Amino acid sequence: DKSDVSANMDETKYKATPNQYVGENTTVEEVITNPAFGDFGRLLFPVDRTVSEDMTLSEVSTSSVYVWYNYIQVDKTVEIINSLIDDANSGNQIFYNVYSEEEMQTDSSKRDTGLFFFKGEENAPFAIMNAGGGFMYVGAMHDSFPHALEASKMGYNAFALIYRPDDPYADLAKAIEFIYDNADELQINSNEYSLWGGSAGARMAATLGNSDNLAQFTGRTDIPQASAVIMQYTG
């Protein structure tokens, strides 16, 4: 139901103040309880991995949390989080549920999904970044947030998808549907978009970047095929 999905557009804007910026010694708990992140702060970190709220950003930015990844830079983690706080301070909505409240009540696992929005220029094309994690977890902080941030700096409207490792293709299809149906409110160009991904995310991008698969997963033929698919790497 588009009306249910569109209700997400009217959520309260989450704001923070400059003294709530984070640093490498900020704890996970302090991040997820920051007013900028409302009730979705936990999704900044992998919900399918054990991440203690007592860990600092320096401690969490390691391959012990983000398994299979190396060269994780806490400075980039800090930059990403503070950039989102800045966007919230500016009155921008930085997170969207892609499923309706009714859908999430029916299937609580859908609460572990959503789109972090790194806003670019008005009516510019959009991109959806899909992190890897071996279909075991979503390594967004290291494998999709940095790409979304840099794309937004270039003017593109970038979304980083938090998906369920057990149902990734359905979640990406729902995300594409949500963005397409709410393009006017999001102030984006819905006719030109790209799908990005690394590892598991690359497979997601390649699958949903195919028009037949897109129609199969969405049940619709009105949504255009992605203009580009960027498969960074996959195993």
Which sequence ranges carry the predicted segments?
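N-terminal targeting or regulatory segments adjacent to alpha/beta-hydrolase or S9 domains
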Residues: D1-R111
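A short loop-to-beta-strand scaffold at the N-terminal edge of the catalytic core in hydrolase folds
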Residues: D107-K119, P125-F126
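Short amphipathic alpha-helices and their capping/turn segments at secondary-structure boundaries
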Residues: G114-G120, R220-Q225
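Short beta-strand element of the alpha/beta-hydrolase
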Residues: A124-G133
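A fold-wide structural signal in alpha/beta-hydrolase
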Residues: F126, S152-I162
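Short beta-to-alpha linker loops that shape the active-site pocket of alpha/beta-hydrolase fold enzymes
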Residues: G133, I162-R164, G235
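Catalytic nucleophile-loop/oxyanion-hole region of alpha/beta-hydrolase
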Residues: G139-D143, F159-S190
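Primarily recognizes the serine-hydrolase "nucleophile elbow" in alpha/beta-hydrolase
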Residues: K174-G235
